[in-house]
């Protein structure tokens, strides 16, 4: 019997709705991955609601929780770490300490860093030093980084002028250490208004993917968290990087179709669960 992969997911949690682990854990489980959720923050709801309550996990709690997993002899069974929203740079450094410990216990373990930053339209709040930490420290340890365009712009210190420029910016981030960059959402002058575009960039090649852009009165939150989680999960399940990239795009599109059909603001993960596991659509990644 094939072994089920285990993944430590270190990111935010909301009690109501879907963001961070609340967006990614169930879909990752649904496609066949054992997920160990470690919540960096616990908020009542995501921050696009403009008001929320909750608290940030103290940085020292992260290694303490990983110590607990090690104490029961399970740390070597961790096949990957996924990190997302950080409450502080100190929290990020605690995560990197945990990643190093897991990679020591299992040298084949992977680390995907989803470099969540502030978004002026979505009300996502991160501490100012988090951006520097992600670029200067996390990138060197990550196997994969999955920025959106806003985050890629922040890393590059500029906005792109073309798709080719986006590719150059992703390659510059790749040079800092990761073996692959997934740009979850491209935005550049001349991009088709009715399309949602993504990039996969490795040292050997690059791929561009386009799917239809669905309209919503208010854009759902958690789409990027879902994308990163599904991509990493499919890699753990044996997909090559391009297949995992294509699967993540298709499964996320299925969730958005269901969310749109229901007129929902929050992602309809439960209603779309069978389509997450077995997407009916397919989007081809085109090699550039």
Curated annotation (Swiss-Prot):
Instruction: Write the gene name.
Output: pdxY
GO biological processes: pyridoxal 5'-phosphate salvage
Q: EC annotation?
A: 2.7.1.35
Which co-factor is required? Mg(2+)
Residues involved in substrate binding? 12, 47-48, 225
Instruction: Name a GO CC annotation attached to this entry.
Output: cytosol
Assembly, in brief, is: Homodimer.
HAMAP family the record matches: PdxY (MF_01639)
Write out the function statement from the record. Pyridoxal kinase involved in the salvage pathway of pyridoxal 5'-phosphate (PLP). Catalyzes the phosphorylation of pyridoxal to PLP.
One GO MF annotation is: ATP binding
Binding-site list for ATP: 114, 151, 184, 211-214
Reactions catalysed, as given in the entry: pyridoxal + ATP = pyridoxal 5'-phosphate + ADP + H(+)
Q: State the NCBIfam families in the record.
A: PRK05756.1, pyridox_kin
Question: Does Membrane show up as a keyword for this record?
Answer: no
Alphabetized PANTHER family for the sequence: PYRIDOXAL KINASE
Q: What is this protein called?
A: Pyridoxal kinase PdxY
> What's the source species' lineage?
Bacteria, Pseudomonadati, Pseudomonadota, Gammaproteobacteria, Pseudomonadales
**What Pfam families does the entry give?**
Phos_pyr_kin
* Pathway per the UniProt entry: Cofactor metabolism; pyridoxal 5'-phosphate salvage; pyridoxal 5'-phosphate from pyridoxal: step 1/1
Similarity section:
Belongs to the pyridoxine kinase family. PdxY subfamily.
Which keywords label this protein? ATP-binding, Kinase, Magnesium, Nucleotide-binding, Transferase
Species source reads Pseudomonas syringae pv. syringae (strain B728a)
């Amino acid at each position: 019997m094939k072994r089920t992969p285990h993944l430590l997911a270190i990111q935010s949690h909301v009690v109501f709705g879907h963001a961070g682990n609340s967006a990614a854990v169930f879909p990752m489980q649904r496609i066949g991955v054992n997920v160990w959720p470690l919540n960096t923050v616990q908020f009542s709801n995501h921050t696009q609601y403009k008001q929320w309550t909750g608290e940030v996990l103290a940085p020292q709690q992260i290694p303490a929780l990983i110590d607990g997993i090690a104490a029961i002899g399970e740390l070597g069974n961790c096949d990957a770490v996924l990190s997302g929203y950080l409450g502080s740079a100190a929290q990020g450094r605690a995560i990197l300490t945990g990643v190093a410990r897991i990679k020591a216990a299992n040298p084949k373990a992977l680390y995907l860093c989803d470099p969540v930053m502030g978004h002026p339209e979505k009300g996502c709040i991160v501490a100012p030093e988090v951006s520097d930490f992600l670029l200067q420290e996390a990138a060197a340890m990550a196997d994969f980084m999955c920025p959106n365009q806003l985050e890629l712009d922040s890393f590059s210190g500029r906005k792109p002028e073309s798709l080719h420029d986006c590719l150059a910016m992703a390659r510059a981030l790749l040079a800092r250490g990761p073996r692959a960059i997934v740009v979850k959402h491209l935005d550049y002058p001349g991009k088709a208004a009715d399309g949602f575009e993504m990039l996969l960039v490795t040292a050997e090649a690059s791929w561009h993917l386009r799917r239809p852009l669905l309209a919503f009165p208010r854009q759902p939150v958690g789409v990027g968290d879902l994308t990163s989680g599904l991509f990493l999960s499919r890699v753990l399940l044996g997909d090559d990087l391009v297949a995992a990239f294509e699967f993540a795009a298709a499964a996320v599109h299925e969730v958005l179709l269901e969310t749109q059909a229901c007129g929902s603001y929050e992602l309809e993960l439960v209603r779309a669960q069978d389509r997450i596991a077995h997407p009916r659509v397919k989007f081809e990644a085109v090699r550039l």
